[in-house]
């Protein structure tokens, strides 16, 4: 026993560290914008938007779709399609190893989830990128799921919505991933010919081959606040042109000012805003639109 232990009253003497109850991990989240420490449950209840500074954190595909679609009548499209290593690609790791790790980390089989359902009773098909799955990169599976979602919308004569959160085309699939740019765009031409709305919602980040293909082809193009949207990243552009880019370059507000997008919508208001848009585009009422 040390001299300090002798001075301390018995009730406040230190306990054995091995018997202390530790604080469970993952209870707190640090906002990357204002650096506030937030209770995870509060953040999730606020759709992963910081309650102090309104910074829109990244959110999983399923959490986003859960917040968007009516609880009843949901169904998933294309979940049976899984990636294959057709090119036997290997960089620092084998492609199948990267796929396996991404599946374990996210619980998803690829970087897109597609669901049919309704928004305030208006039938829709909605697709959403999962950024945590290999950076939301677009490969053959993502392209095929997107097309099947659009085909389902075409068959049912309902609007199609896509939430993008991606670094672009998947390099491990090389030309096969680049083919998805043409494939997805061609499918949207069929929707357009049938006078069915396609709404594109750009979230942080939307880059590369996705931004260069279908991301800006929406009848209405929406973005979340301060989302990074472009083809190449700001650092790459600065290194190429050897100039400092303007403040806020490639952010939602910059694109809105330049006319590249139609509107910026807070995530917490997205469901209501989409319902109103769909009601106008479809010329039908939406029940209980906030």
Swiss-Prot record:
Binding site for Zn(2+): 31, 34, 50, 53
Gene Ontology biological process terms from the UniProt entry: fatty acid biosynthetic process; malonyl-CoA biosynthetic process
Pfam families tied to this protein: Carboxyl_trans (PF01039), Zn_ribbon_ACC (PF17848)
Pathway the protein contributes to: Lipid metabolism; malonyl-CoA biosynthesis; malonyl-CoA from acetyl-CoA: step 1/1
Cofactor: Zn(2+)
TM stretches of this protein: none
UniProt keyword annotation of ATP-binding present: yes
Residue spans, zinc finger C4-type: 31-53
Disulfide linkage: none
Record's subcellular location: Cytoplasm
Chain ranges of the CoA carboxyltransferase N-terminal domain: 27-290
Keyword Cytoplasm in record: yes
Catalytic activity: N(6)-carboxybiotinyl-L-lysyl-[protein] + acetyl-CoA = N(6)-biotinyl-L-lysyl-[protein] + malonyl-CoA
Subunit structure: Acetyl-CoA carboxylase is a heterohexamer composed of biotin carboxyl carrier protein (AccB), biotin carboxylase (AccC) and two subunits each of ACCase subunit alpha (AccA) and ACCase subunit beta (AccD).
Family statement: Belongs to the AccD/PCCB family.
PANTHER family registered for this protein in UniProt: ACETYL-COENZYME A CARBOXYLASE CARBOXYL TRANSFERASE SUBUNIT BETA, CHLOROPLASTIC
Task of the protein: Component of the acetyl coenzyme A carboxylase (ACC) complex. Biotin carboxylase (BC) catalyzes the carboxylation of biotin on its carrier protein (BCCP) and then the CO(2) group is transferred by the transcarboxylase to acetyl-CoA to form malonyl-CoA.
Name of the molecule in the record: Acetyl-coenzyme A carboxylase carboxyl transferase subunit beta
Lineage of source species: Bacteria, Pseudomonadati, Pseudomonadota, Betaproteobacteria, Burkholderiales
Gene (UniProt): accD
């Amino acid at each position: 026993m040390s001299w300090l232990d002798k001075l301390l009253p018995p009730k406040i003497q230190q306990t054995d560290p091995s018997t202390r109850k530790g604080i469970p991990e993952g209870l707190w989240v640090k906002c990357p914008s204002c650096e506030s420490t937030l209770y995870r449950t509060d953040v999730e209840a606020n759709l992963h938007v910081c309650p102090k500074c309104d910074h829109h954190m990244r959110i999983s595909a399923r959490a986003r779709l859960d917040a968007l679609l009516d609880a009843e009548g949901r169904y998933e499209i294309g979940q049976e399609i899984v990636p294959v290593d057709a090119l036997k690609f290997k960089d620092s790791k084998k492609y199948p190893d990267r796929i396996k790790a991404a599946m374990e980390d996210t619980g998803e089989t690829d970087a897109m989830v597609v669901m049919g359902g309704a928004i305030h009773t208006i039938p829709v098909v909605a697709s959403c990128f999962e950024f945590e799955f290999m950076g939301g990169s677009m490969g053959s599976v993502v392209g095929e799921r997107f097309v099947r979602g659009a085909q389902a919308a075409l068959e049912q004569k309902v609007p199609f919505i896509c939430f993008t959160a991606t670094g672009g085309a998947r390099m491990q699939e090389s030309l096969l991933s680049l083919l998805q740019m043409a494939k997805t765009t061609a499918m949207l031409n069929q929707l357009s010919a049938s006078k069915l709305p396609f709404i594109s919602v750009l979230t942080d980040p939307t880059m590369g081959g996705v931004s260069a293909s279908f991301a800006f082809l929406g009848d209405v193009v929406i973005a979340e606040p301060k989302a990074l949207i472009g083809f190449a990243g700001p650092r790459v552009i600065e290194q190429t042109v050897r100039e400092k880019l303007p403040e806020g370059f490639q952010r939602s507000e910059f694109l809105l000012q330049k006319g590249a997008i139609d509107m910026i919508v807070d995530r917490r208001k997205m469901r209501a805003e989409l319902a109103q848009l769909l009601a106008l585009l479809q010329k039908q009422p939406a029940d209980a639109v906030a």
